[in-house]
């Protein structure tokens, strides 16, 4: 019994080959963008260009990989290693000038951008201490105060129970006096003052200086204060305590103010801690 020879193109296929074809068909259906790798079919005289591509054997083929999760065609940033060489480009290599020359004329000031001026001013101010704020009451300050010579002084004294009589700022300090109504034998008079616009304050007692001319019936108290600060003013108010009550004279809420010298060594200047005490 003769067996017919199978046709030349009818090549028996094993299970591994069929499984590889099935796998490639599955990946091609899921990701059509993946390109098949063509393999040249060898012939008798060598390779034939344009031959039909054949599927790879799983052991020799290249398995498809999933596309990046960030989206198709997205390139991930390449990290540089410490050994990566960096390139430096100078402006002249790009057709630019290496230096910019600017000419300034004495009669034409340079044009500095606004943001540069602000930065320069900010840097310059950091080297200086903050300026002290303008002392309160400086615009109303005087070298000498004499309320007793003003009209209506007796009426004010009768209403307030205490009034400033006079105050003078000298090179050794402030000398002043006050009048208080004689409401009782025991009475206490003091002066509350500040040299920094009431950010801090002190209180100095006044001493009895004898009876004051009538009317009305009153007593006189004298006080001493330090000299006003240079370029500032000394603010003060009078306090009167008698029979458990308290009365104030603060110049109608504006405080009394004595002006200090404009420059060190000027009129009215004194040592910072210069005090004059008397009994």
UniProtKB/Swiss-Prot annotation:
Residues 51-65 have a biased composition (Basic residues). GO terms for biological process: glycogen metabolic process; positive regulation of glycogen biosynthetic process; regulation of glycogen biosynthetic process; regulation of glycogen catabolic process. Residues 248-256 are annotated as: Substrate-binding motif. GO terms for molecular function: [phosphorylase] phosphatase activity; glycogen binding; protein phosphatase 1 binding. The modification Phosphoserine is found at residues 16, 33, 66. A motif (PP1-binding motif) lies at residues 87-90. Expressed in liver and heart, with low levels in skeletal muscle. Residues 28-89 are annotated as: Disordered. It comes from the Eukaryota. Keywords: Carbohydrate metabolism, Glycogen metabolism, Phosphoprotein. PROSITE patterns: CBM21. Residues 176-198 are annotated as: Glycogen-binding motif. Residues 154-259 form the CBM21 domain. GO terms for cellular component: glycogen granule; protein phosphatase type 1 complex. The keyword Phosphoprotein applies. The CBM21 domain is known to be involved in the localization to glycogen and is characteristic of some regulatory subunit of phosphatase complexes. Acts as a glycogen-targeting subunit for PP1. PP1 is involved in glycogen metabolism and contributes to the activation of glycogen synthase leading to an increase in glycogen synthesis. This is Protein phosphatase 1 regulatory subunit 3E. It comes from Rattus norvegicus. The lineage of its organism: Eukaryota, Metazoa, Chordata, Craniata, Vertebrata. The gene is Ppp1r3e.
């Amino acid at each position: 019994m003769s067996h017919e020879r199978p046709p030349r193109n009818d090549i028996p296929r094993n299970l591994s080959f069929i499984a590889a074809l099935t796998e490639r068909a599955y990946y091609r259906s899921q990701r059509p963008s993946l390109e098949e790798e063509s393999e040249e079919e060898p012939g008798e005289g060598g390779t034939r260009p344009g031959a039909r591509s054949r599927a790879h054997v799983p052991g020799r083929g290249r398995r498809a990989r999933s596309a990046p999760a960030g989206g198709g065609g997205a390139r991930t940033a390449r990290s540089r290693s410490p050994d990566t060489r960096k390139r430096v480009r100078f402006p002249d290599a790009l057709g630019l000038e290496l230096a910019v020359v600017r000419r300034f004329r004495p009669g034409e000031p340079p044009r500095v951008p606004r943001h540069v001026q602000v930065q320069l001013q900010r840097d310059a101010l950091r080297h200086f201490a903050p300026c002290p704020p303008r002392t309160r009451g400086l615009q109303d300050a005087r070298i000498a105060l004499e309320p007793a010579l003003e009209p209506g002084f007796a009426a004010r004294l009768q209403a307030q129970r205490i009034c400033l009589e006079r105050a003078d700022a000298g090179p050794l300090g402030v000398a002043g006096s006050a009048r208080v109504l004689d409401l009782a034998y025991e009475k206490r008079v003091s002066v509350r003052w500040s040299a920094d616009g009431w950010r801090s304050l002190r209180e100095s007692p006044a001493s009895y200086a004898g009876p004051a001319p009538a009317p009305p019936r009153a007593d006189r108290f004298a006080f001493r204060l330090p000299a006003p600060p240079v370029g500032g003013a000394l603010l003060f108010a009078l306090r009167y305590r008698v029979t458990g009550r308290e009365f104030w004279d603060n110049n109608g809420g504006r405080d009394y103010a004595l002006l200090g010298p404009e420059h060190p060594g000027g009129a009215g200047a004194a040592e910072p801690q210069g005090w004059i005490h008397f009994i």
